[in-house]
Amino acid sequence: MKLFGLIGEKLGHSLSPEIHNKVFKDNNIDGLYNLFSVKKDFENNIVESLKCLGVRGANVTIPYKEKVMNQLDIISHEAKAIGAVNTILIKDGKSYGYNTDYYGFGKMLERAKVDIEGNSFFVLGAGGAARSILKYLEDSKAKKIVLVSRDKEKVFKKFKDFNINFMSYGELEEIHEEFALINTTPCGMYPNTNSVAVSEKVIKKFKVALDIVYNPLETKFLKMAKDNGLKTVDGLFMLVGQGVKAEEIWNGIKVDKSTEENIYEELKCRF
């Protein structure tokens, strides 16, 4: 049996086991997916511990996505650029790090038929979640990428390696019609379901609204967007997509789209 798992600090309500167990079943993989709750005292021994336990692959979540990087032998191009690893592969005694949030975001857009090349994207929020999204948009030849934050100067230093523009929320109020608006902030996430990062006036200026929040599935941001005629995309398929990509890395397989869809539909019923 192959052993896999999720590494983090507080993992009580993770949906990851359901995603991975479905992939195991559909691909005849004899696998076991565990939750590994790691105290901060042991954060410097994560990869060595995985090797000792015989773990083949692991997902990494808050607060260890950055801290685990210096423990790895090889880090993928996208993970280096993003500055975070959320997937580890242990193979032939070596450890490899990847960022499958990058691919999960791509799968989310592909499924929703949102074209990137030649279009403009405005990203709300400058936390860790924004980095994988900015990198994917950059690599996919978006015409214009704008990072919207409360402190433009501070964020410029943090994201100076990206080929993007910077804007404050006040400046966002003054823009004209653009293509897509992406929420990467926790605004609207349960239990703060009434919060939204921008006004309806701003939302109306876009054609597409995407939210990486998936609980609830339709956030206040997406509801406002839908009511104003925008195409809306929820964040659940990004979660599914990043998990599926991890399985492809760990097991050297190509997961069928029907499996991704079935996982999405099963999880959707939860929210």
UniProtKB/Swiss-Prot annotation:
Q: Which UniProt keywords apply?
A: Amino-acid biosynthesis, Aromatic amino acid biosynthesis, NADP, Oxidoreductase
Query: Which transformation does this protein catalyse, written as a reaction?
Result: shikimate + NADP(+) = 3-dehydroshikimate + NADPH + H(+)
Q: Does the keyword Amino-acid biosynthesis apply?
A: yes
Binding residues for shikimate? 14-16, 61, 86, 101, 214
Q: Upper taxonomic classification of the species?
A: Bacteria, Bacillati, Bacillota, Clostridia, Eubacteriales
GO CC terms in record: cytosol
What HAMAP family does this protein map onto?
Answer: Shikimate_DH_AroE (MF_00222)
* SUPFAM superfamilies registered for this protein in UniProt: Aminoacid dehydrogenase-like, N-terminal domain, NAD(P)-binding Rossmann-fold domains
Assembly state and interactors? Homodimer.
- Xref: Pfam families: Shikimate_DH, Shikimate_dh_N
Query: Organism source for this protein?
Result: Clostridium perfringens (strain SM101 / Type A)
**Name the UniProt record assigns to this protein:** Shikimate dehydrogenase (NADP(+))
Give the record's family classification.
Belongs to the shikimate dehydrogenase family.
What does the record give as its pathway?
A: Metabolic intermediate biosynthesis; chorismate biosynthesis; chorismate from D-erythrose 4-phosphate and phosphoenolpyruvate: step 4/7
Q: What does this protein do?
A: Involved in the biosynthesis of the chorismate, which leads to the biosynthesis of aromatic amino acids. Catalyzes the reversible NADPH linked reduction of 3-dehydroshikimate (DHSA) to yield shikimate (SA).
Q: Which GO terms describe its molecular function?
A: NADP binding; shikimate 3-dehydrogenase (NADP+) activity
Q: Which GO terms describe its biological process?
A: amino acid biosynthetic process; aromatic amino acid family biosynthetic process; chorismate biosynthetic process; shikimate metabolic process
- Gene expressing this chain: aroE
